[in-house]
């Protein structure tokens, strides 16, 4: 059906402008109100489905209000002509499409024509003058005259919240009705008002900490002065129409406790651990960081001791007896450390993993060997360079002197750090920890004496270690005992590249027990990518499997086969 045939039924009033683009005869929703329908190619949104239908049907995106208001033609007329909101109500279904209703069939009280100045603005924008209308239909009155002609028609149908404010002052309207009141009593719908004109946004607080969270001025001060203002809403790219200016935020009451200083909150840690006030803790924090070694933990946190540090730091005031003890401890510490030339510089958990991997590649041994103590294998019981590593058939159990000496060394390190903290915090915090420091010094001297006695007890002789001496009776075959007791094994272990302590410790030969547990049977299998080494293979430095290769390289092939055979089998 042609357009002429379709427009014949409409009437003579609409036939004259049937081929012309339809005017936007409605105002979209006021800014700030929810919407149900939105155009997908322009910012038009409305609560009425028929309005969006007309918008899409007549391709009104180029004529929509949001685009019209941006034009310079509308910018010069904005002060004189201000559109009134027209209520989209279901009582007037014919007005959603004015082309399907004759002009003479309008209610008498209603304003004649589409009751908006937007049509005139559109006509001025596109054609440069009022549109030619059907004969007999009066032209649109001026806005001032239209304001006086309000009858019981459209203004009676307006919802209560959409009526313009009666006071005339936009600031006199309540904040809840600000967005819903008409443009004569408030800010216009489009474009969104300036941040200072919309008072409802003054209660909006968006920050990283949540909505309506009180923002203190120095909360984001660690970002710098330029970023501190933008840090309140970093997640909104175009937050300028939503946020008020910086003066719109109400002045936050200063809290009783000041905002923590932005240096990683170390004064808070000191305050919680040592019970200092916040200001004194911030003063006491300053001399701690430059003097402490590179591996020391945060000040005030004395949870995990670090045994791999250098000599213990010296405290400020001390009597000569304690100074001498500290010097001896500082001299004995590097000697113990430097005996291990290739000791891995790893975190504390890594040597235990290395120890477990190297032991899992050993031949089958006792279960006490597979699950040793929790101490650090690079502990202070390691001897000096004058003798090789003491290899014991059984790993040190928790009651052994090695374990006790390791615990004593950790306790000594803890006491040294506590004394250092107290010596540095004493003048700054105004405390007097002199009695506590003296008592800690006495305890540390006693621990040092016990530790040195234990170290002298476990120090091996200077001769090469004779591995034929066993503490447990040999239950395995005699050939294996002879193979393990060869004197060439000592030079293989002591000469060459020094291994990390976790690597060398498991290489001690274990007498085979009568039965094999599942864990030992699993650990007797070599790694899948590494075949069994021939007797002339070199020692792989730094790997746990190389220790076993070095151990087997000085043995006969029969002994190597006996190591990999089940325990009940004959060699």
Curated annotation (Swiss-Prot):
Gly residues bias locations: 165-175
Biased composition (Basic and acidic residues): 316-336
One Pfam family from the record: zf-C2H2_7
Segments of skewed composition (Basic residues): 16-26
Compositionally biased tracts (Pro residues): 380-399
InterPro entries in the cross-refs: ZNF750, ZNF750_Znf
Record-given protein name: Proline-rich protein 35
Organism encoding this protein: Homo sapiens
Gene for this chain: PRR35
């Amino acid at each position: 059906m042609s357009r002429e045939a379709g427009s014949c039924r409409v009437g003579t009033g609409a036939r004259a402008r049937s081929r012309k683009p339809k005017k936007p005869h409605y105002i979209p929703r006021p800014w700030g109100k929810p919407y149900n329908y939105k155009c997908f190619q322009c910012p038009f949104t409305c609560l009425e489905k028929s309005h969006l239908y007309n918008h899409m049907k007549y391709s009104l995106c180029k004529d929509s209000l949001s685009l019209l208001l941006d034009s310079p033609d509308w910018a010069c007329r904005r002060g004189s002509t201000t559109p009134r909101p027209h209520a989209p109500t279901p009582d007037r279904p014919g007005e959603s499409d004015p082309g399907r209703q004759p002009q003479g069939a309008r209610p008498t009280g209603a304003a004649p024509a589409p009751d908006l100045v937007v049509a005139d603005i559109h006509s001025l924008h596109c054609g440069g003058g009022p549109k030619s209308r059907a004969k007999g239909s009066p032209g649109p009155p001026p806005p001032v005259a239209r304001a006086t002609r309000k009858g019981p028609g459209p203004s009676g149908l307006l919802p209560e919240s959409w009526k313009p404010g009666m006071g005339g002052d936009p600031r006199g309207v309540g904040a809840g009705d600000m967005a819903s009141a008409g443009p004569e009593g408030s800010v216009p719908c489009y474009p969104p008002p300036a941040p200072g004109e919309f008072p409802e946004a003054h209660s909006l607080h968006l920050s990283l900490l949540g909505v309506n969270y009180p923002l203190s001025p120095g909360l984001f001060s660690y970002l710098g002065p330029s970023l501190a203002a933008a840090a309140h809403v970093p997640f909104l790219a175009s937050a300028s129409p939503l946020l008020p200016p910086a003066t719109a935020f109400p002045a936050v009451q200063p809290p009783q406790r000041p905002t923590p200083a932005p240096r990683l909150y170390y004064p808070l840690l000191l305050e919680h651990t040592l019970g200092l006030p916040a200001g004194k803790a911030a003063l006491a924090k300053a001399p701690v960081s430059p003097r402490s070694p590179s591996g020391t933990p945060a000040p005030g946190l004395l949870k995990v001791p670090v045994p791999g540090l250098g000599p213990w730091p010296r405290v400020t005031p001390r009597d000569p007896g304690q100074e001498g003890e500290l010097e001896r401890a500082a001299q004995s510490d590097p000697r113990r450390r430097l005996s291990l030339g290739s000791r891995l510089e790893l975190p504390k958990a890594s040597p235990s993993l290395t120890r477990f991997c190297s032991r899992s590649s050993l031949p089958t041994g006792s279960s006490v060997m597979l699950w040793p103590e929790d101490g650090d294998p690079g502990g202070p019981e390691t001897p000096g360079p004058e003798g090789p590593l003491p290899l014991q058939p059984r790993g040190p159990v928790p009651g052994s002197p090695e374990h006790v000496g390791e615990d004593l060394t950790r306790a000594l390190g803890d006491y040294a750090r506590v004394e250092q903290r107290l010596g540095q915090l004493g003048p700054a915090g105004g405390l007097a920890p002199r009695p506590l420091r003296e008592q800690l010094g006495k305890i540390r001297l006693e621990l040092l004496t016990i530790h040195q006695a234990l170290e002298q007890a476990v120090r091996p002789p200077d001769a090469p270690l004779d591995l034929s001496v066993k503490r447990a009776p040999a239950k395995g075959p005699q050939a294996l005992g002879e193979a393990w007791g060869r004197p060439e094994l000592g030079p293989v272990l002591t000469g060459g590249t020094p291994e990390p302590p976790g690597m060398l410790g498991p290489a001690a030969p274990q007498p085979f027990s009568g039965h094999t547990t599942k864990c030992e049977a699993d650990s007797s299998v070599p790694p899948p990518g590494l075949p069994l080494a021939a007797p002339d293979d070199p020692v792989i430095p730094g790997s746990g499997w190389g220790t076993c290769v070095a151990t087997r390289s000085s043995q006969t092939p029969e002994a190597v086969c006996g190591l990999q055979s089940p325990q009940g089998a004959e060699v």
